[in-house]
């Protein structure tokens, strides 16, 4: 097993200690979240009771294969806790998420939860967000106009950089909701809130990967052990 996977498992194992029997749980998407699902499934086999809302079809499939009971936000609109990964996390626990393409559902599930705990390895911790390209989920209609509006909004925020339509097997990547994703390489984002507001003002933008004020804590695994970052 490589070192990167060991760190993901370590963070996932620590997060599992926050999950109590009978909880309604939001379950994230991505490689670290999948390690959490595998550990959770082992506890479920031993009689531990949880019911989960997955943030993607991929996560739902893994949960079903491993025997983790699932529900929906229609049936269970209020969740106790969400456990999810992140592409970047800063000292204020603002995040960039969406590398796996599930940012819309991830944000809906996190917002429906009493709290959100992020699991990640040390490489995801940054002083300022933006090293990882920011995923922006957009409606397929009017793509060119939407990209132009994103560029203009970024300039007003003092940002610029390539906007790339995400591809999969040579065709535009489609989210579970049937939307495109534009990956914005703005570089450092010193004011995530201002950029967030500017992006949401664009009609063609469905969602973006800036998660601000949602994470309560981040469990960070490094070669020297586990540390927990808490939002001030």
Swiss-Prot record:
Q: Name one Pfam family in it.
A: Rib_5-P_isom_A
Query: Binding residues for substrate, per the UniProt record?
Result: 29-32, 84-87, 97-100, 124
A GO MF term = ribose-5-phosphate isomerase activity
Q: Which GO terms describe its biological process?
A: pentose-phosphate shunt, non-oxidative branch
**Which reaction is this enzyme known to catalyze?**
aldehydo-D-ribose 5-phosphate = D-ribulose 5-phosphate
Which Gene3D superfamilies does this one have?
3.30.70.260, 3.40.50.1360
Q: Which UniProt keywords apply?
A: Isomerase
- The record's top EC class is isomerase
EC number(s) per entry: 5.3.1.6
What InterPro entries does the record point to? NagB/RpiA_transferase-like, Ribose-5P_isomerase, Ribose5P_isomerase_typA_subgr, Ribose5P_isomerase_type_A
- The catalytic site is made up of 106 (proton acceptor)
Which pathway does the database say it acts in?
Answer: Carbohydrate degradation; pentose phosphate pathway; D-ribose 5-phosphate from D-ribulose 5-phosphate (non-oxidative stage): step 1/1
UniProt cross-references to SUPFAM superfamilies, sorted A to Z: D-ribose-5-phosphate isomerase (RpiA), lid domain (SSF75445), NagB/RpiA/CoA transferase-like (SSF100950)
The subunit structure is: Homodimer.
Q: What job does the chain carry out?
A: Catalyzes the reversible conversion of ribose-5-phosphate to ribulose 5-phosphate.
The family note in this entry says: Belongs to the ribose 5-phosphate isomerase family.
Which protein, by its recorded name, is this? Answer: Ribose-5-phosphate isomerase A
Name the source organism: Brucella suis biovar 1 (strain 1330)
């Amino acid at each position: 097993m490589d070192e990167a996977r060991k760190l993901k498992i370590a963070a996932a194992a620590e997060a599992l200690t926050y999950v109590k029997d009978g909880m309604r749980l939001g379950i994230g998407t991505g490689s670290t979240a999948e390690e959490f699902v595998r550990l959770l499934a082992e506890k479920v086999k031993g009689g531990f009771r949880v019911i989960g809302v997955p943030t993607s079809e991929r996560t739902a499939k893994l949960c079903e294969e491993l025997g983790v009971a699932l529900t929906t936000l229609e049936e269970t609109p209020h969740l106790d806790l969400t456990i999810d990964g992140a592409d970047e996390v800063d000292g204020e626990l603002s995040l960039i998420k969406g590398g796996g393409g599930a940012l819309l559902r991830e944000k809906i599930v996190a917002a429906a939860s009493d709290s959100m705990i992020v699991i990640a390895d040390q490489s995801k911790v940054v002083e300022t967000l933006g090293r990882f390209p920011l995923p922006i989920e957009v409606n397929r209609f009017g793509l060119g106009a939407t990209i132009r509006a994103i560029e203009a909004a970024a300039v007003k925020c003092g940002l610029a950089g390539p906007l790339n339509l995400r591809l999969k097997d040579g065709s535009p990547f489609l989210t579970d909701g049937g939307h495109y994703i534009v990956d914005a390489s703005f570089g450092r984002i010193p004011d995530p809130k201002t950029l967030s507001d500017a992006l949401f003002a664009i009609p063609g933008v469905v969602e973006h990967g800036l998660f601000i004020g949602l994470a309560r804590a981040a469990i960070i695994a490094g070669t020297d052990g586990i540390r927990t970052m808490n939002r001030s």
